[in-house]
Every structure is written in structure tokens, then in C-alpha cells.
Swiss-Prot record:
InterPro entries: ARM-type_fold (IPR016024), DUF4487 (IPR027902). Pfam families: DUF4487. GO terms for molecular function: protein kinase binding. One of its GO terms (cellular component) is chromosome, centromeric region. The gene is firrm. This is FIGNL1-interacting regulator of recombination and mitosis.
Length: 911
């Protein structure tokens, strides 16, 4: 009997005949199916086998009698059908009817193949006996291979068929529908099968293959059908957990976790796009609109993926060490989509909150369960972690969230986060406190804007929004309050490191937390910290940012010391010792108890008197000015204290008067140390302005007028403005008004032309203070001569905004400021890290010219200094009121002459 005759005959048989001829005919059909090269015949035979003979096979014969022999050929033929479509698709058009019919025939054949496989699944599901995987082993692998190819073809169809999709669209739709039904049936079938704990190696390998194959399908169908995508993920997770003890060490956990992360990110982005469309269409309130229902459906998917990820990580955490960096990145990416992140899209608040609850609540639960997992902590606390600027704030908020959870963690997790890496062989990681300060420092733009965050509960009521600084500070202090004492050392090291870095606001945050630690701890701890900072201050180079930051901490902590410890501190760091002046110059007397304050005032005045006398007795040498400036800094401390006694005021006025008599504009302009002296004298004079004699005020104003304002450092200008503003408090005597008042007007005019907007703001403030209380109104009129100056002052006093800045423009400006601030901090820290003397290179020839130029610049600078000093000395001698110079002056000049001769001789020899 020929093949055609057999097929025609079998197609006429009823079910009873098929059952009777099963053992004879089925092997022949399988052989025919294997040997045929005709797609049509292949499909016809497969339909006959699955519809007429498969129902009569016993459960034990399904695999050997049908599936293992027939299904491998199905996979090959299905792949060849897809390959043929790819070859012929280029010629498809509405005019080429022959090719159109050919391709439609192939697609129909593919649909029929899927129908046959669905028939196999339905039959196995209908069997009442308990089905084992060995009974159907070839069926899942065949179906999953065909499904993967089918879904991939459907996914690529829009590009593959391009504008000709309408010619085959109905068949593609039917193909997808049949594949959808087939996968659903297969998952139902596999769900009925139960593996025993004694499952064979082969069976375990099979179920792992099924899970991985479904994962591959998940990656394909993510944008094709939401329901199928979700159901496939449910099945993957369910099967993974169902057979956890068998498959947990064989699953590709990294692939599964990465795929879940990508699907969650994609779903959140889809939700936000829908929310933006709703906002643009003005449908925020239309809760029954199709758009809003679509948004709710998308939000449901987000919640599903987030909860699925939480469930998966909970069950397989120990196998997810390689995925921790992706989980960390996911947390940052998701949080960057919501306020207060500056890159969060603009969406209606109600929709944003709905999505936030759906996603961030599960993400927080995931963070909680990952807290004790060391690879996750290492990823979050990695010192070398690099991320884009938009993730700086999410990283900071993540760390703040971690601190809030530490109190509920076991000791091992607490040590993991709070202590940092302890040994070289460990993966480097910061302590969470150090990481918070580092991430806060990076949030420059967020601090400039500033972003606002919800406040904590206070007396049963929620605070309003707070700044990032306050948010971080409150949560860090709350963490410190419950931190066991054995974890204080890494906290203290982190606080000190944050104080010693260049960003001032980060140092201020560390200072706030440090003060809380000092108040929360014992008095002895506070005293110990103050002594430590005092020693660090003594070791700091003058004028550095570290000195400024340490001084900030010292001032704050002195307030918190007990009176007994304050007195001990005064005794431990007496002002009679030169090295202690740098400690006291940065304190505030009002923070001290009465006994300590009186001691400091007495020591400062005694020391100042001694230093001034020694300076005058030595001939007012320029080299002694730095020593004089150090004690003047401390004198300013006394002046700034409240309730200064009359005796102190008299002593201070005497010191100030003597020093003003020695200041000459020509010298001040040249010497930086004298500029510092004048700055201090101006600040002192501003406070004691009502106690100064008129001729001293004249000397101060004249000295200030003689300076070239545009060449003075900013701190000197600010002190000058403070002094000028204080002049409004006094009445200038008539005999010197003609000399003083015009100079005041001229100085204000000069300051008002400063290009720096920051200095200009201080100038306007100072002029406003002066104008508000002065009796000399002619100074005001003389200052406001030009319309430009008058306009600046009036706009400032009336608080007129010159131009309104859009939010976009402001944000761009702040981004530019951010770059400037970061560059400035990096520059300061790089200067600090450079050695004092750069070692010579072995081959300096390439840079020889630059070294010579630098030497010439140094010669020029020092010669100018020497010339200025000699001219100033000459001016003193030529003065009419100057007495004859003492004998030691002539001797010193003779020594200088000898030194000049020696320098000339050396220069001639070298040339």
C-alpha cells in the first residue's frame, strides 16, 4: 500500500478502527512523517497522528510511541518554514499574488502545527492518571522551541513585513493566538506534574531547561502581551520555588534577576509615559477615561514585577551575589523617577503617588531583606562606585534609608554596614556614615535648588517639607541615638573625615551630627572631642579650609561643655603659649561660663599688650607682623563677646589706636601680612567705633582711602564695609568732616563699581545700614551722584527684582555653579595633597624654560617688596614730624648694604 493510499484510508477510519490498527499503522505513520520532505504532507501526517492515534496510546507509551519519535521532526520543519519566509519576504507585494498565496500557505501550515501540539497538550491534561515528566519528556522541549520561534516571528513582523503586513495580518494574528493558547496549556500541564525529592538527574535537568526556556520566551513577549508576560513570570517563579531544593543551584539566577529588573524598569517608564500623556490631555480628574484605566493596568504590572522580585530575592538570596550591583542600580533608577529627584518627569501628583506606592513600597521591603547580605552592602558602600549625576540623590536617600533600618538588624548586619572593611583582603567598603557624607557632598545641585523632602513626625504631627541637609541630619542623628557604643569609632572617624574635606556644607552636616553625638554622649566624651579638635587646630596650616571647618566644630562643641570642663580647657590651652592662639582665635566668648570667659579676656589683653610692646621695641619690624596678627585675632574674640568691661574697652582702644598710627597705605598695598593687620583693625574699629578718638577714625579712613580697592583681597573689603557701615553710628566732629566725609563717599562709590555680585551685595547692605542711621546725609547724596549707582541702591532697598528667571534657566545656571563649586573643592584638595617641594625630575630639559620664567617672577616679586619697604622707610625719615632715627637704624641699614653687595657679587660670579 502506497503512502498516499494509506493516508487516504486512515483519514476515513473511525476511532474504533484507529484503536484496533494502532500498533500496526502508527509506526508506519511515524516513519512516513520522518521521511517526507513535503511540508503539506508533514502537517497532514502530524494531524492524523495527534487526532486519531494519540488518544488511544497508554500513558506509558506516549513518549516512546509518539513524542520522542515524531516531535523532533516537528521542530526542524517549523524552523524551515520560518527560514523560507525570511528568504521570500523581500518579494512580497499586493501585485505578486503567487508569492502572497505561497507565504499565506506557509503561515497556515504553522498554525496547523501549533494546533496539533495543542491537541497533544489537551490529551495529556485529560488523562486522569498521575502524569510524570518522563511520560512526556519530549513534548515540553518541542513546544517551547516552537513557541520561542513563533513569538520571535510575531515580534519581528512589523519590521519584517514592513508596509505589507496587511497582506498576512489575519494569519499572523491567528498564529499568535494559537501560540498563546498552546503556552497557556503547556504551563497548566506542567503545573500538574510533581517531582519527588528523589527525582533523577535527567528529570532535574529537564525542569531546569523548561524554566530557562520560558525565561527566553519572557524576554521576547515582554512587549507583545501583558497578560501572557505576567503569567509566564508567575509560572517561572512558582516552578523555581516549587522545586527549590532540586534546582536552586542549577538555575541561572543572574539571568532571571536581571530580566526581572529590566521588566520592572520598563514597566515604570511605560507608566510614567502614560501619566504624562494623561497630563498633556488634561484628563487628570477623568478617572473613568480609557487612558486612566490603561494607566491603572500598567501600574498593576509594576506592582506585580516589584512584588515578584521581592519574592524571588527572598527565596534565592544566597545565590544572588552577582546580581547585587544590579539590584543597587535598580533601586537608584526607580527612585530617580520620582520627586524630589530633579530628573523626575512632570506627572500629576495623584498618579505619581499611585505609582510610588505600587513600586517603592515593595522596593523598600526588598532593601530590608537584602540588608544582611554582604555582597549587597559591598555594592552600596563601594568607594569606587561610579554613577551618573541623576543618581547622586537616590544614592544618598538609599543610604539614609539604610541608616533608619539598622536598629532592627542583627549585630552582624549592623557591623557590616557601620564598621566598613577592616582588613586588606576584604572587598573595600565604606561605613554607612562615611558613604552618607560622600554622597551628600555629590548632591551639590540638589542642595542649591534646593530639593525638599518630607519631614519626620513631631509630637504626632508630620512636619512640612525639609531640606536635604535637615533630612539627612535628622535621620543620621536618630541612627546615632540607637547605635551601640562599640560602633562609635567608625562614626567618629567618618565625622572627622567629613569635617576635613573641602565641601563646607558637608562639613556643616558633620558638625551638626557631631554636636548631637556630644550632647547625647557623656560630658567626658564631649571634653575629649574638644581637646582632640584643639590639637588638630594647632597642627593645621594657617588659612586652609580644614582650619575653618575644625574651628566651626570647636565653636559649637564649646557651648556643650560643662563649666568645669570649660575652665579645664582654658587651663590646658593657655593664651600665654603662642601655639594656642590659633585655637582661641576661632572661639566665641559667649559660649563660655563666666569664670572661663573672664580668664580668657584677661589672658588675651595681657598677651596683646606684651606682643604690641615687643613689636614696638623691636622697631616695628615687618617680620613680626604675623605674630601680631595672631593675637589681634584673639582680641577680636574679646571684642565680639558680650558684656565687655569698661577696663577692657579702654585697653582695647589703646591697642587699636597705637596700631592705626603705624599703618601706611603704601606699605599695606604691598605686604599681605599688613593687609591682614588692617583687616583685623577695621573689624575691631567697627565694634568699638563709639569709643575711638576722632583722629584715629581719620587715620583709619585715610589708610583705607589710600588703598587700591580693586587690588585688595575680598576679606579686607568685607572688613572695610563693616567699618564703613559702623561710621553711621557716630557724629564726625566738624574739624575733620571735610577730610572724612568725602573719603567715605569716595570709598562707597569705589565699592559700588565692584564687578562681583557677591561683594556688591555686601556693599549695598553696608551702605543701607550706614544711610539708615547716619546724621551726615551729605555722604548719601555724594555717593548717589550717578543714575547707575542710585538705581542699584534704590532697587536693593526696595527689594526690586531686576529680571525674573525661569525655572529652566535657573536650573541651568545652578548646574554651572555646581561645576564651579566642585572644581574649586577639587582644586583645594589637590593643592593640599601636593608635597611642599616637588622633587626634581631626571630629565628636566623639556621644562627648563618654564623654570627660568618662574625664577624671574620670584626675583621681581621680592625686589618689589624690598623697594616698597625701603621707600616706606625713606618716607618716615623725610617726614617733618618724625624724630631722628635711633642709632640701631643706621647699623641695620649698614647690614642691609652688606647683604646687597654679597647678592651682587654672587650674581656676577654665576653669570
Amino acid at each position: 500500500m502506497s503512502q498516499v493510499t494509506l493516508l487516504d484510508e486512515v483519514s476515513q477510519w473511525n476511532q474504533e478502527t484507529c484503536q484496533q490498527e494502532l500498533k500496526t499503522v502508527l509506526p508506519k505513520l511515524v516513519a512516513m512523517h520522518h521521511d517526507t520532505d513535503s511540508w503539506e504532507e508533514h502537517t497532514n501526517i502530524l494531524q492524523i497522528i495527534t487526532s486519531r492515534f494519540l488518544p488511544h496510546l497508554s500513558l506509558s507509551d506516549l513518549e516512546t510511541g509518539c513524542f520522542s519519535t515524531a516531535l523532533p521532526k516537528v521542530v526542524k520543519v517549523f524552523a524551515s518554514l520560518l527560514e523560507e519566509i525570511s528568504k521570500q519576504i523581500g518579494g512580497l507585494s499586493s501585485q505578486n499574488t503567487e508569492l502572497q498565496l505561497f507565504l499565506r500557505k506557509i503561515l497556515k501550515t504553522m498554525v496547523q502545527t501549533l494546533e496539533c501540539l495543542s491537541g497533544c497538550v489537551r490529551h495529556v491534561c485529560s488523562i486522569e492518571e498521575s502524569v510524570s515528566f518522563s511520560n512526556i519528556r519530549s513534548l515540553p522541549s518541542c513546544i517551547l522551541g516552537v513557541l520561542k520561534d513563533t513569538f520571535q516571528h510575531c515580534k519581528d513582523s512589523e519590521v519584517m513585513y514592513s508596509g505589507r503586513l496587511s497582506l498576512v495580518g489575519d494569519l499572523l494574528q491567528g498564529l499568535f493566538k494559537e501560540a498563546y493558547s498552546l503556552q497557556k496549556g503547556l504551563m497548566e500541564l506542567l503545573d500538574k506534574i510533581n517531582f519527588e525529592d528523589t527525582a533523577s538527574e535527567e528529570e532535574i535537568s529537564d525542569i531546569v531547561t523548561v524554566i530557562h526556556s520560558l525565561l527566553d520566551i519572557c524576554l521576547i513577549i515582554s512587549r507583545l502581551d501583558i497578560a501572557l508576560h505576567a503569567n509566564t513570570w508567575k509560572f517561572i517563579i512558582k516552578q523555581s520555588i516549587k522545586y527549590q531544593s532540586l534546582v536552586e543551584d542549577r538555575l541561572h539566577h543572574t539571568d532571571i534577576s536581571f530580566a526581572l529588573c529590566e521588566d520592572l524598569c520598563r514597566s515604570v517608564e511605560n507608566c510614567l509615559e502614560l501619566a504624562q500623556q494623561i497630563q498633556q490631555a488634561g484628563l487628570q480628574e477623568a478617572v473613568h477615561s480609557p487612558e486612566y484605566k490603561l494607566f491603572q493596568k500598567a501600574t498593576k504590572m509594576c506592582r506585580f514585577f516589584a512584588n515578584t522580585l521581592v519574592h524571588y530575592t527572598k527565596e534565592f538570596k544566597v545565590f544572588l551575589s552577582k546580581s547585587c550591583s544590579r539590584f543597587h542600580q535598580l533601586y537608584l533608577q526607580i527612585n530617580s523617577k520620582f520627586l524630589p529627584s530633579l530628573c523626575a518627569p512632570s506627572v500629576p501628583p495623584t498618579l505619581s503617588e499611585e505609582l510610588r506606592v505600587a513600586v517603592l513600597v515593595p522596593m523598600d521591603a526588598m532593601l530590608t531583606q537584602m540588608m544582611s547580605f554582604q555582597p549587597f552592602a559591598e555594592s552600596v558602600l563601594n568607594p569606587d562606585h561610579q554613577s551618573s549625576a541623576k543618581l547622586f540623590l537616590p544614592q544618598c536617600l538609599l543610604l539614609v534609608n539604610v541608616m533608619g533600618k539598622l536598629s532592627s538588624q542583627p549585630e552582624e548586619a549592623l557591623r557590616l554596614w557601620s564598621d566598613g572593611s577592616q582588613f586588606p583582603e576584604e572587598t573595600p567598603r565604606w561605613s554607612v556614615f562615611e558613604a552618607v557624607f560622600q554622597s551628600f557632598r555629590l548632591c551639590v545641585l540638589e542642595r542649591l535648588v534646593p530639593v525638599c523632602l518630607p519631614g519626620v513626625m513631631l509630637r504626632g504631627q508630620a512636619q512640612g517639607t525639609v531640606s536635604l541637609h535637615q533630612h539627612v541630619c535628622v535621620h543620621m542623628c536618630a541612627c546615632v541615638a540607637v547605635l551601640p557604643a562599640q560602633h562609635f569609632p567608625p562614626l567618629e572617624r567618618s565625622l572627622l573625615a567629613a569635617v576635613l574635606q573641602a565641601d563646607t556644607q558637608t562639613a556643616l552636616l558633620a558638625t551638626d551630627v557631631w554636636c548631637f553625638l556630644a550632647r547625647y554622649g557623656t560630658a567626658e566624651l564631649c571634653y575629649h572631642h574638644v581637646v582632640l579638635i584643639a590639637h588638630l587646630l594647632r597642627a593645621c596650616p594657617a588659612g586652609g579650609y580644614q582650619l575653618f571647618h575644625l574651628a566651626l566644630v570647636l565653636r559649637r562643641l564649646l557651648f556643650l561643655m560643662t563649666p568645669k570642663h570649660q575652665v579645664e580647657f582654658v587651663e590646658r590651652f593657655p593664651l600665654s603659649q603662642e601655639e594656642n592662639l590659633c585655637v582661641w582665635r576661632h572661639t566665641l566668648l559667649k559660649c563660655l561660663c563666666v569664670e572661663a570667659r573672664v580668664r580668657v579676656e584677661e589672658q588675651v589683653l595681657d598677651r596683646a599688650t606684651v606682643v604690641l610692646e615687643e613689636w614696638q621695641n623691636s622697631g616695628c619690624r615687618l617680620g613680626e607682623i604675623p605674630r601680631l596678627n595672631r593675637i589681634l585675632d584673639c582680641v577680636l574674640l574679646v571684642v565680639g563677646g558680650s558684656g565687655t568691661q569698661n577696663e577692657c574697652v579702654e585697653s582695647l582702644v589703646k591697642i587699636i589706636s597705637q596700631l592705626w598710627s603705624h599703618m601706611r597705605s603704601s606699605q599695606v598695598q604691598v605686604h599681605v601680612t599688613l593687609q591682614c593687620t588692617v583687616k583685623l583693625l577695621l573689624s575691631l574699629s567697627a565694634v568699638l567705633i563709639k569709643s575711638l578718638e576722632p583722629h584715629i577714625i581719620l587715620q583709619a579712613v585715610s589708610c583705607l582711602s589710600g588703598l587700591s580697592i580693586h587690588q585688595c583681597p575680598d576679606d579686607l573689603l568685607l572688613a572695610a564695609l563693616e567699618f564703613l557701615a559702623s561710621l553711621g553710628q557716630i557724629f564726625i566732629p566738624p574739624n575733620i568732616q571735610g577730610q572724612v566725609l568725602p573719603q567715605i563717599s569716595s570709598l562707597f562709590n569705589g565699592f559700588l563699581t565692584r564687578p562681583s555680585w557677591l561683594i556688591l551685595h555686601h556693599v549695598l547692605e553696608a551702605f543701607g545700614c550706614f544711610a539708615e542711621i547716619t546724621n551726615h546725609e551729605e555722604v548719601i547724596s555724594q555717593t548717589l551722584k550717578t543714575e547707575e549707582v542710585k538705581s542699584k541702591v534704590l532697587n536693593f532697598l526696595s527689594k526690586t527684582v531686576s529680571r525674573q528667571e525661569s525655572e529652566e534657566t535657573r536650573l541651568e545656571r545652578l548646574k554651572e555653579w555646581k561645576c564651579v563649586i566642585e572644581k574649586h573643592c577639587q582644586q583645594m584638595e589637590s593643592e593640599k595633597s601636593q608635597p611642599a617641594q616637588t622633587p626634581l625630575t631626571e630629565e628636566p630639559c623639556a621644562k627648563r624654560a618654564r623654570q627660568e620664567t618662574k625664577a624671574e617672577e620670584e626675583y621681581e616679586r621680592y625686589l618689589q617688596t624690598a623697594e616698597g619697604a625701603l621707600k616706606a622707610l625713606q618716607a618716615i625719615e623725610r617726614s617733618e614730624h618724625s624724630p631722628s632715627p635711633p642709632q640701631w637704624v643706621r647699623a641695620r641699614l649698614q647690614l642691609l648694604q652688606t647683604l646687597i653687595t654679597q647678592i651682587n657679587t654672587t650674581t656676577e660670579e654665576q653669570s
